[in-house]
Amino acid sequence: DALPIYKLVLSRSKTIRKDPSFSPGKAFFAAVERYIRSYVYLCHTPETGTWMGGTPEILLSGEKGDWQTVALAGTQSLRDGKLPKSWDHKNWREQQLVASYIRRQLSTLGITPEEKGPYSARAGEVSHLKSDFFFSLPNPEKLGDVLQLLHPTPAVCGLPKEEAYHFIIENEGYDRSYYSGFIGWLDPKGKTDLYVNLRCMNILPQTFTLYAGGGLLAASQLEDEWQETEDKLDTMRRIVGNL
């Protein structure tokens, strides 16, 4: 029997018209300046088209024996550009679910990580609760095993993972494309930096398609969750609208 879903991340896209004077290069450098604590990218391939995004969520980062991942969840808007002084129970609970998931997944490989946090961390126009996890991975050939265990994280899917994944596929109603995948540099013999592809956009000839999502718990207020996705979409909308 399927287990009950106790966290679910649903997302949406928003398409806006592109100004004829838009420059991807200028937008990228504007994003780099604005989102200094995020991984910012501008990527084009014939297969994927052109994508740009900024994400604060490390999926897996490290080299040799030293590795890191993060639990990033809970969202509040900045107040006068400052981090919040307190968080409600719903946001704490959401972040703790992600942290517990990471501990549990790593433990299947015999890994007990060192932890730092949770603490408030800025990401564009919003803030999140963040915990850092540091661990050793003597055999770099295990990178694929770690990635398979961590992805998709509860920050983009839900818990239990399989039940949430199938609910999203059957009910979300659109194709996420590359949103909520992971992006970065993978080098088992050198430095690897992989991030969850959160706030992002697909740059098309006449339009941008922006993507964002929000985590739903039993205590969630739907109007607040909708506004959270608006705040996240604003992160990218400000970049393309203020050049």
Predicted segments with their positions:
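Short, small-residue-biased leader/transition segments that mark boundaries at the very start
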Residues: 1-3
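Short acidic/polar active-site loop segments enriched in Thr and Asp
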Residues: 6
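A short glycine-rich, hydrophobically flanked beta-strand micro-motif that places a catalytic Asp/Glu
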Residues: 10, 41-42, 111, 176-184
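An anion-binding catalytic pocket shared by soluble metabolic enzymes
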Residues: 12, 16-97, 190-213
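A glycine-rich phosphate-binding loop feature that marks nucleotide/adenosyl-phosphate handling sites
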Residues: 12-15, 45-51, 102-103, 118-126, ...
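Contiguous alpha-helical scaffold segments within structured protein domains
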Residues: 17, 68-170, 241
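Conserved hydrophobic core element of enzyme catalytic domains
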Residues: 136-243
